[in-house]
Amino acid sequence: MDSQGLKTLINYYCQERYYHHVLLVASEGMKKYSSDPVFRFYHAYGTLMEGKAQEALREFEAIKNKQDVSLCSLMALMYVHKMSPNPDREAILELDTKMKEQRKEAGRKALYHAGLFLWHIGRHDKAREYIDRMSKMPHDSNEGPILKAWLDITRGKEPYAKKALRYFEEGLQDGNDIFALLGKVLCLEIRQNYSGALETVSQIIVNFPSFLPAFEKKMKLQLALQDWDQTVETAQRLLLQDNHNVEALRMLALYYLCREGDVEKAATKLENLGNALDVMEPQNAQLFYKITLAFSRTCGRNQLILQKVQSFLEKAFSLTPQQAEIATELGYQMILQGKVKEAWKWYRTAMTLNESNISAVTGLIRCQLIEGQLQDADQQLEFFSEFQQSMGKSAELMYLHAVLATKKNNRQDEVINLLNDVVNTHFSHLEDLPLGIQYFEKLNPDFLLEVVTEYLNLCPIQPAGPGQPLSPVLRRCSSVLETIIRSVPGLPQAVFLMAKVKYLSGDTEAAYNNLQHCLEHSPSYAEAHLLMAQVYLSQDKVKLCSQSLELCLSYNFNVREYPLYHLIKAQSQKKMGEVAEAIKTLHMAMNLPGMRRSRASSKSKHRTEVDASHRLSIFLELVEVHRLNGEQHEAAKVLQDAIHEFSGTCEELRVTIANADLALAQGDTDRALSMLRNVTTEQPYFIEAKEKMADIYLKHRKEKMLYITCYREIAERMPSPRSFLLLGDAYMNIQEPEEAIVAYEQALNQNPKDGTLARKIGKALVKTHNYSKAITYYEAALKSGQQNCLCYDLAELLLRLKLYEKAEKVLQHSLAHEPVSELSALMVDGRSQVLLAKVYSKMERPSDAIAALQQARELQARILKRVQMEQPDAVPSQKHFAAEICAEIAKHSAAQRDYEKAITFYREALVHCETDSKIMLELAQLYLAQEDLDASLRHCALLLQRDQDNEPATMLMADLMFRKQDYEQAVYHLQQLLDRKPDNFMTLSRLIDLLRRCGKLEDVPRFFLMAEKHNSRTKLEPGFQYCKGLHFWYTGEPNDALRHFNKARKDSDWGQNALYNMIEICLNPDNETIGGEVFENLNGDLGTSPEKQESVQLAVRTAEKLLKELKPQTVQGRLQLRIMENCCLMATKQKSSVEQALNTFTEIAASEKDHIPALLGMATAYMILKQTPKARNQLKRIAKMPWNPIEAEDLEKSWLLLADIYIQSAKYDMAEELLKRCLCHNRSCCKAYEYMGYIMEKEQAYTDAAFNYEMAWKHSNQTNPAVGYKLAFNYLKAKRYVDAIDVCHQVLEAHPTYPKIRKDILDKARASLRP
């Protein structure tokens, strides 16, 4: 590294207070550049700051006559003398005189180094004077402006930072000045432009790869951007270059402690850090001290970490025993370790060193509170309160006030207000601080956990019931804990307390997830096992509850002394019906030390107060089990004991409420209400008592007016945002949203920044169907700066109202912001992107929808990466959301026929949520569409294994069995569903289709009978009529089919399909091959007769009328409608109409890849227009496509038409292959049998021809006379005269005038029978 690089390194280490580093770099500079006195000066300065004043004096004396450093050396000599306990006044006077003389004659360099030295010792204003003088001299260097910028920036204020950035930019115009680049980084950091700062650091690393502070900066900036992975990578890279790098070791230790929660690895890194400090900064007491702060506050009072930290502090104190702040910190360490006597000693030592040390006094008050010296603590706190305004608010002193108020049994609301002030004051010091070492120190999770514990002591110990509003105290706890877990996800105590908050909030699922996460990292956490037992108990999982209690006891035998342990055990025994055992367990709990005030020793006083709510719960549970055991007298006796025991305490009203609950359980609502009415506004449980009364009025007496009166009384007597919120929620409970809006607005007036209230008002307006007002309200709320979550609600409403463009604008506005790192903000963005995709889908912009979903997927990947550490309770829901996003992308891909992509995303969805039956079903269906039967069967079987009653999966399994030609199994699966529910018409319609494809339509009628027997009104059901129509259509009875479909056509569920089927029947009642030529002239002149022509035209007009009734809601539905409209045009057989249809089909085929109905339409049009080669090309294209159930009918028609073309060309083998394919997928396909018969007849294989015509005659239900004619003719040729005569009679019975059959076949068959 060159001279300038080394000097920048020295400046950096001076500012960071790494004085041994200064010494080492200066030594290196002296070796490389022995003629440069600057390095000798900083060697002396480093020596001085390490406490070796005499050695430093000698070094400064040796260089005080060197021109460039003479002025700063004289200043340094004065500084040394002034630092001395007994300063030499004469020497100082003499040096001052010399310095003034030197200053008059000093050149640019001398002034620059003097300014630099003054900056390093914190004399900013004096330094500026020297730099200003220097700037007035002629120069061609940027040194002065760059140092001036550094002076501005180290003031740490935004306006100065702006000006400093300008100076640094000017300083960089002539090249990459490393000192200016470092300054620019700091400027951007102060302005919170961490990405920009990181870019600049990268610039330093590229140009100066051996400049290690750049890597340290990079590491800290990556942490500020909350990218722990990159931070760790940079730290490890640093250690490869310098294995004693203090910052890298500190960062890795913090990573293992805060992020991973791996205490052993963190302790190892701390050990390495201590060794590195001994080598690199052995005399730096301040560094030893400052390094401990973040660790002691984030380790969750882990003894291993605290012992390491203590050794650092003891080293620091041994180096500077006069430092009161280090003694104070040692006192705090003793508190954290539970060594109160040791803490007293260190706090008193600190007071001796500095009588005005506020932190030491605060520590002493804390000791007094722990020891129960309430009067002394009260006096001290009173004294501090008098001058707290002048010294600024202290969160810790407020907290001690709150603790004292709790111990003195002050009103709950007073304690809550104090704790609220503590939190607000504490978090005000964190504003604008990025994630980093200072943030961890200021956040002080340990302190916040103490505050949360105090909050929780004020909460009801019973979880909130369903629909019960969340307690503001619990909401506050949740907010504080979210902040801790977001920053220090490796802290098990925070995760445990979050689980407790979730449990008390009634969210047992979230509590369970948090506890699982907590116990994975800390399996011996006894209290977590205890809470897990409570969670299991609330979920009625009694065996698991018992297992958790056993685990708890195995990890900590002392839990037998916890009343809570016995309480949970008794409750689980009660649930198992072991009431007598529960009574024994509770009596054991009643005999525990501290359970009764009269028995409580001073030693157990603190713990008794903390567990007061659990003590009361033991009493109340004992009342309950005695009552259940029929021991009413004993129950009443225990309740009286509870009244006596808790009289005058903050728990007294819980006894009253429990007494009311007991009366209520006995059906005495009057007595319950009488007790609750006695609770006054001044008492702590007033709101809870009123809520209980309201509940009685609503649920037991069904008196809505008295119910709402209770909440009105709360709002009148205690007018607060919470009271009006409760009133609003109460109005919503009784379906009075207009009144609810008024109450919510009153709450919002008192708390205008509460986004939750704004959302409630919006939702209430939507509930009143006042949509326009709701939109106006949301828009106004957003303009006034309400939370961005309102954007989502507004967009959702606009989507619901089909105002797609407005919804798109709202969502785009909500997403148009700088990149965010807050987890909650990322979640909002993810949800907004998914909603935007829904909007795009409705606007028929599938590519934009997929793009939005891809954005959501990327966001969700980031969320999942962080949520496991920061919000473990949210992991299942976030994984489910990630699966939904992937499934949506898969659906869009499948719609665009990109099946491979669809399968990839469905698989990804199952990685997130492997048990999601809906996604598994969709993937199985997709595999089926891809003809991958084994993969489809595998997923379907797995799904049915988990849920054997899953209807769609059973239907899919039936499809699969059909594809595998296992028809009996296919029918069996659908029969299973119908046996369970005979009137399941969706399944019945599918079964009819399946029996048709199996060639067993004769089995259908019995299922109609089953449905009719199941419900006498079945015949009136549109689904039943639809299924009947389907059966008649498939059995060659088009008129009956139309009649039944007509009865279903107005139904919302069945109507659209019924209409499509009716249109198809109108266009092709006899199920002919439209466009086919083989059978075109078989019926002679019947096809061209006026009656036939008129009948066709009438049918087309009917189809056109029916088309107008179709109202498709999807893109595919609208496409299907277009296809049908053009099929109507083709049915007219008029050239212009057919050509018009052909153009439309061609357009669709061009825009929709492999669209079978459009390709079939084109082929049919070409056949009608007598352009057979073009038709054949399209049909051959279709023939290469795999079969799928959705397009089965069109595929069948395509194969039949292509077979017709091949037969016309006498390519019978190719035709047979296609016809066999038709029969493979539909054994009732009359037309396929008819064509096969025709081929056999042409080949004079009359027996085979007769067999195929026989199948065609059977499956057309003997209704088609043309098929009957051909069958009789081939019987005649095969010499089966009796069969030929029977068929002739069947045809003539239905069609007496059918031409030629009598003369050509009947008479000849009879003649052949005569001897």
UniProtKB/Swiss-Prot annotation:
Keywords, ordered alphabetically: Cell projection, Cilium, Cytoplasm, Cytoskeleton, Repeat, TPR repeat
Signal peptide segment: none
GO BP field: Bergmann glial cell differentiation; cerebellar Purkinje cell differentiation; cerebellum development; cilium assembly; forebrain development; forebrain dorsal/ventral pattern formation; intraciliary retrograde transport; negative regulation of eating behavior
Molecular function as annotated in GO: chromatin binding
NADP in keyword set: no
Any GO CC annotation of this UniProt entry: cytoskeleton
Pfam families per UniProt: ARM_TT21, ARM_TT21_2nd, ARM_TT21_4th, ARM_TT21_5th, ARM_TT21_C, ARM_TT21_N, TPR_8
Keyword field contains Cell division: no
TPR repeats: 108-141, 145-178, 192-225, 285-323, 324-357, 492-525, 563-596, 616-649, 721-754, 756-788, 790-821, 830-863, 883-916, 918-950, 951-984, 1022-1055, 1196-1229, 1231-1263, 1265-1298
Places the protein is found: Cytoplasm, Cytoskeleton, Cilium axoneme
Its job: Component of the IFT complex A (IFT-A), a complex required for retrograde ciliary transport and entry into cilia of G protein-coupled receptors (GPCRs). Essential for retrograde trafficking of IFT-1, IFT-B and GPCRs. Negatively modulates the SHH signal transduction.
Subunit structure: Component of the IFT complex A (IFT-A) complex. IFT-A complex is divided into a core subcomplex composed of IFT122:IFT140:WDR19 which is associated with TULP3 and a peripheral subcomplex composed of IFT43:WDR35:TTC21B. Interacts directy with WDR35 and TTC21B. Interacts with TTC25.
Family: Belongs to the TTC21 family.
Protein name, as recorded: Tetratricopeptide repeat protein 21B
Lineage of the species this protein comes from: Eukaryota, Metazoa, Chordata, Craniata, Vertebrata
